[in-house]
């Protein structure tokens, strides 16, 4: 049986990046990378540091992204739902909240069998009428939910700045 030997001058507090297998860091529904199945760093070498999981662009950066935007004339939410068909998605407005729900039962893919489900909630800004909200699904699997913002009534007005000679903050008396 092999035993990893650590040199006495290498102390664990100085190696905060030492980490065991990243098997549980995976994003559910995505396949494992070969590096997820490598032995832990201590069995390889005391000098080996596994790269952080957030650097794995294909499985981390590509899927499940959600972006909410509040622009001058509209409010929009873009959500990556490429693993779901339109029949497996629901978009509802409850009061001042948009709820997006997606669910598909177990089915086979290239890695085995998988089922997925998610719930997302987004607060509707006060200047967006919930009755005007619409949704659409693009060909590449991005769900867009948006609504127009109410225009501010009244003309724009510039407010003049006056200068005062006394300070806004007075010094506290010294003890």
From Swiss-Prot:
The modification Phosphoserine is found at residues 19, 45, 59. GO terms for biological process: apoptotic process involved in morphogenesis; cellular response to gamma radiation; lens development in camera-type eye; microtubule polymerization or depolymerization; muscle contraction; muscle organ development; negative regulation of amyloid fibril formation; negative regulation of apoptotic process. Keywords: Acetylation, Cardiomyopathy, Cataract, Chaperone, Cytoplasm, Disease variant, Eye lens protein, Glycoprotein, Lysosome, Metal-binding, Myofibrillar myopathy, Nucleus, Oxidation, Phosphoprotein, Secreted, Zinc. One of its GO terms (molecular function) is unfolded protein binding. It is found in: Cytoplasm; Nucleus; Secreted; Lysosome. Changing residue 171 to T: In CTRCT16; uncertain significance. Residues 146-175 are annotated as: Disordered. The record marks 48, 60, 68 as: Susceptible to oxidation. Lens as well as other tissues. Expressed in myocardial tissue. Zn(2+) 2 binds at residues 104, 106. Glycans are attached at residues 41, 170. Belongs to the small heat shock protein (HSP20) family. May contribute to the transparency and refractive index of the lens. Has chaperone-like activity, preventing aggregation of various proteins under a wide range of stress conditions. In lens epithelial cells, stabilizes the ATP6V1A protein, preventing its degradation by the proteasome. Heteromer composed of three CRYAA and one CRYAB subunits. Aggregates with homologous proteins, including the small heat shock protein HSPB1, to form large heteromeric complexes. Inter-subunit bridging via zinc ions enhances stability, which is crucial as there is no protein turn over in the lens. Interacts with HSPBAP1 and TTN/titin. Interacts with TMEM109; in the cellular response to DNA damage. Interacts with DES; binds rapidly during early stages of DES filament assembly and a reduced binding seen in the later stages. This is Alpha-crystallin B chain. It comes from Homo sapiens.
